[in-house]
Amino acid sequence: MAQGKVARVNGPLVVAEGMKDAQMFEVVEVGEPRLVGEITRIEGDRAYIQVYEDTSGIRPGEPVFGSGAPLSVELGPGLLGQLFDGLLRPLGEIKEITKSPFIKRGIKLPTLNREKEWHFVPKMKKGDKVEPGDILGVVQETGLVEHRILVPPYVHGKLKEVVAEGDYKVEDNVAIVDMNGDEVPVKMMQKWPVRVPRPFKEKLDPSQPLLTGVRILDTIFPIAKGGTAAIPGPFGSGKTVTLQSLSKWSEAKIVIFVGCGERGNEMTDELRSFPKLKDPWTGRPLLERTVMVANTSNMPVAAREASIYVGVTLAEYFRDQGYDVLTVADSTSRWAEALRDLGGRMEEMPAEEGFPSYLSSRIAEYYERAGRVRTLGNPERYGSVTLASAVSPPGGDFTEPVTSTTLRFVRVFWPLDVSLAQARHYPAINWLQGFSSYVDLVSDWWIKNVDPDWRIMRDFMVRTLLREDELKQIVRLVGPESLAEKDKLTLEVARLIKEAFLKQNAYDDIDAFSSPQKQARIMKLIYHYNQYATNAVERGIPVKKIVDKITVVPDIIRSKATIKNNELQKYDELENKLKAQFDELLKEAGA
């Protein structure tokens, strides 16, 4: 293993000499405090190291110790419900040891608790043939998640020994595999390098929607399990609240929340609210399915890159167990800014706006780790990693490099509009700029499981909103009175779509989460309102009279916050009222 000396210190970048045996991306310990760093460039016997802790006080001549291994994380029981820093060190345990709210430099703590015992139930027996990814046994980690202990990738052979059911620590051997004459011990935990994607048998097309309970995300711009999404938006437009809604209410079995360079208060909000909130799909506390990686804005800049890779590696580990995983990163712009900072210190040739020229390949590497896969091992199982990331363009400029590069690699775009946020329209997703490439892929699921008319109603709503935008231009020029009655109706229906469907209060107990069935019922009411009103307009009834006489519309708008997901029969009453009022209107008009 390489051992050298510090030659130069420039913020989080340390240049060490005498490192001719070092390797790219090798983890090293820098200086007397033994700060963790990673080699990002080698020139002769000089190694350029990005240090993941504060380098204050490190001086030339101090030793640098190589580890001979890349940056790796521990994977096993004990991850769920925990809060870690960007290097996957447990923050709760660090606080207990240091008795301080701050992380001391050079502190080394394993990710997984070595003393805690887990109840292991074997699923294979002595003499069985094992392949990478086979389920050796299970541990009930939380009330919500059964942790499956897998044969590590690249281990195969015959099971020479497997322990009996009982309580074991993560470092205990639970099996011994005879691999071509060598005895390979298998522990409950395994290590994996964060920059290397975990292997799988086959990548599949995403076909099932990842339901989020947020109406505009589920219906207008749906994301599939194994999909990629970006949420760009300026300061104050609601990125964090939208991502928190995703992590709270989405149908994913596991949620990895990575706070990358954002304010610490946002992680605090999550930590305070998650233990109290119940998962709407299972009724269990949300924290039982969540892992939080906190790398806030006051932590070292270089560790932002580590936290992004750590988050996606955790997601792949749970995916390999056969789970649908959602990884939420807030925000990838801060990671890109860290790359720019380090690139500048390493005197690399800058590209657009000072970002390094390899920005696009790094962003692509990250998003390419999403997907729905058939995993290694038996029994056959399928898992997915869905990546949803916030992007924070300065001043809301979507043409800046991070946003425009991200757009090339994601298939769902949820752009936040500050003018909608100022008008108190939340979530402030611009329905004219956004897009989803998964609509065709997930339509079959909605049609089969929720409503046969789902695609017709969804397309009608999108068409109405686009037409409303065209009509607004005319109204600005010549005023609303010049419009034909059918165009006035389009404006009224678009208003109803926005008020009754697109607007959603993330802090309302009922409105925060809409089941797929509830979403379809609201859509159906709006669709029928349009049909009945179009019929009335064709019979000569002016739109103003329709608006005055159809008094059930405010009830339809309020229904999102008054009708619970298990009270859908109340929509039948609204449907009957709507029909009765239109029948009465037609009778009065003699049409």
UniProtKB/Swiss-Prot annotation:
Q: What is the lineage of its organism?
A: Archaea, Thermoproteota, Thermoprotei, Sulfolobales, Sulfolobaceae
Kindly list the GO CC terms recorded for this protein. Answer: plasma membrane; proton-transporting two-sector ATPase complex, catalytic domain
Protein name, as recorded: A-type ATP synthase subunit A
Keyword Membrane set for record? yes
Q: What class of enzyme is it?
A: translocase
Q: How does it sit in the membrane?
A: Peripheral membrane protein
Say which family it is in: Belongs to the ATPase alpha/beta chains family.
Q: Which GO terms describe its biological process?
A: proton motive force-driven plasma membrane ATP synthesis
EC identifiers of the protein = 7.1.2.2
Keywords, sorted A to Z? ATP synthesis, ATP-binding, Cell membrane, Hydrogen ion transport, Ion transport, Membrane, Nucleotide-binding, Translocase, Transport
UniProt GO molecular function? ATP binding; proton-transporting ATP synthase activity, rotational mechanism; proton-transporting ATPase activity, rotational mechanism
Which InterPro entries does this one have? Answer: ATP-synt_VA_C, ATP-synth_a_Xtn, ATP_synth_asu-like_sf, ATP_synth_asu_arc, ATPase_F1/V1/A1_a/bsu_N, ATPase_F1/V1/A1_a/bsu_N_sf, ATPase_F1/V1/A1_a/bsu_nucl-bd, ATPase_F1/V1_b/a_C
Its subcellular locations are: Cell membrane
Task performed by this protein: Component of the A-type ATP synthase that produces ATP from ADP in the presence of a proton gradient across the membrane. The A chain is the catalytic subunit.
Instruction: Share what the entry says about its subunit structure, partners included.
Output: Has multiple subunits with at least A(3), B(3), C, D, E, F, H, I and proteolipid K(x).
Q: Where does ATP bind?
A: G233, P234, F235, G236, S237, G238, K239, T240
Pfam families membership: ATP-synt_ab, ATP-synt_ab_N, ATP-synt_ab_Xtn, ATP-synt_VA_C
Report which reactions are catalysed by this protein.
ATP + H2O + 4 H(+)(in) = ADP + phosphate + 5 H(+)(out)
Judging by the UniProt lineage, the source's domain of life is Archaea
Can you list the disulfide-bonded cysteine pairs?
Answer: none
Asked if the Swiss-Prot or TrEMBL record annotates the protein with the keyword Ion transport, the reply is: yes
